[in-house]
From Swiss-Prot:
Catalytic reaction annotation: L-glutamate = D-glutamate
Physiological role: Provides the (R)-glutamate required for cell wall biosynthesis.
Domain of life where this protein originates: Bacteria
EC number: 5.1.1.3
Protein's UniProt name: Glutamate racemase
Residues of the active site: 74 (proton donor/acceptor), 189 (proton donor/acceptor)
Organism: Bartonella henselae (strain ATCC 49882 / DSM 28221 / CCUG 30454 / Houston 1) (Rochalimaea henselae)
Lineage: Bacteria, Pseudomonadati, Pseudomonadota, Alphaproteobacteria, Hyphomicrobiales
A Pfam family recorded for this sequence: Asp_Glu_race
Positions of substrate binding: 10-11, 42-43, 75-76, 190-191
GO function term, MF aspect, one: glutamate racemase activity
GO biological process: cell wall organization; peptidoglycan biosynthetic process; regulation of cell shape
Length: 270
């Protein structure tokens, strides 16, 4: 069996929603979670500057850890440069996290779907290509929130969420027109599932919320060699790397719940 680790990458701790699902399918693998929290949030970065930063980080990561596969657990990075990563590192398997627009278009009954994302994901050409390819017959509302990813990070650090502000961020997702209304909202940021119970509480009406984490987990498992013997005991511990030194006690507790040992202040030579 290939004993190389599976690497997860995000700007913060939102990608833990994806790690949780992948780990449930292949618990025997070693997982390395990388959070470039110095760069958080990625949604407001200038594109070329962010691309250069990510490429430098991955040049370092892949040299040091030689993973079997990398999960880009960040919609902003995936929609911006998954093709660039595959081209630069052709020997590495990459699984991206992109808006589940195809699935939403297949499941909507009203034809009205919304994509709740970051500003970066909303403006990406990749996102609009997904809509044109799979949801051309649908009314697709793109909503780029500048605040929700930060709300999720703060919530996971034990801080309270301003529900009125959260409600204002999701209100544009709820569209009524010609007797029809939104029936599906795509969560297009890996941070957002951590806020899902708040979204449901503040929703204007009942909708289906699509979290792509399970689909990403299945895709990841399909790309890795299947174990011959049903090994479930890890040989190596999982761990997390953070680029900042500022890891709060609540974040440490969260990572402990995910059985991740922490190394902070990692310098990726960016």
């Amino acid at each position: 069996m290939d004993e190389r680790p599976v690497l997860f990458f995000d700007s913060g701790i939102g990608g833990l929603t994806v790690l949780r699902e992948v780990r449930s399918l292949i618990p025997e693998k070693q997982f390395i979670y990388v959070a470039d929290d110095v760069g958080f949030p990625y949604g407001n970065w200038e594109e070329n500057v962010l691309k250069n930063r990510i490429l430098k980080i991955f040049t370092n990561l892949l040299t040091v850890y030689n993973p079997a596969l990398c999960v880009i657990a960040c919609n902003t990075v995936s929609t911006l440069m998954i093709a660039d990563l595959r081209e630069r590192f052709p020997h590495i398997l990459f699984v991206g996290t992109v808006p589940a627009i195809k699935l939403a278009a297949e499941q909507t009954k009203s034809g009205f779907i919304s994509v709740l994302a970051t500003p970066g994901t909303v403006k990406r050409t990749y996102t609009h290509e997904l809509i044109n390819s799979f949801a051309g017959q649908c009314h697709v509302q793109l909503v780029g929130s500048e605040k929700l990813a930060g709300f999720a990070e703060n919530y996971l650090r034990g801080q309270s969420v301003d529900l009125e502000e959260l409600r204002n961020e999701i209100l544009p997702c709820f569209v009524k027109k010609n007797g029809k209304h939104t029936d599906i909202i795509v969560l297009a940021c890996t941070h957002y599932p951590f806020l899902l119970h708040f979204f449901r509480e503040q929703a204007l009406w009942h909708v289906q919320w699509i979290d792509p984490s399970k689909a990403i987990a299945k895709r990841t498992r399909s790309l890795l060699p299947q174990r011959i013997h049903h090994q479930t005991v890890k040989k190596y511990e999982d761990f997390a790397l953070f680029t900042s030194q500022n890891i709060t006690s609540s974040t440490k507790r969260l990572l402990k719940e995910f059985s991740l040992n922490i190394t902070k202040g990692v310098d990726f030579k960016v």
